[in-house]
Amino acid sequence: MIRVRAVLPPEWPLWRTLRLQALADAPYAFGSRLSEWQGDGDAEWRWRDRLQSVAFNAVAEVRGTPAGMVSGADGGGEAPKEAELLSLWVAPWARGRGVGDALVETVLAWAASRARDTVSLSVREQNRPAIALYRRHGFVDVGPDGGEESPELRERRMVRSLHDR
């Protein structure tokens, strides 16, 4: 059984464990590096700040074992009716069990509860499993995100309307 629940700043050790696992397992999928969150970067205040500065953070558990994570951020400035799906990761042992689907659905529900019109995300072009996951949930590729020349770092922007389904 998959359970997805919000994570609050006092649970920073859980978020830390999952985030470090994610950065070690899939460094190509994130904007930060494992080394940036280790050593001097591995401080309680920093983990708490990460959880406080992003509007929504959640973990997925399979039979009580942490299996994945995701965040949701409010759009701002030019996109106040948009939310953004960030930092989705599923532990290798939990892939193919619906954990990614549950995490995406949780962010979509969170965004709808905040009266957002769309949810957007950025995904590395080479991350085919993630792109397939997002397409299953109605996300559409709207083009390149940024001007990165290096093929392994190129990202695509995907958007999902919350009014289409």
Positions of predicted regions on the chain:
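Acetyl-CoA-dependent GNAT
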Residues: 9-93, 104-106, 110, 141-145, ...
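Extreme N-terminal starter segment of soluble prokaryotic enzymes
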Residues: 1-4
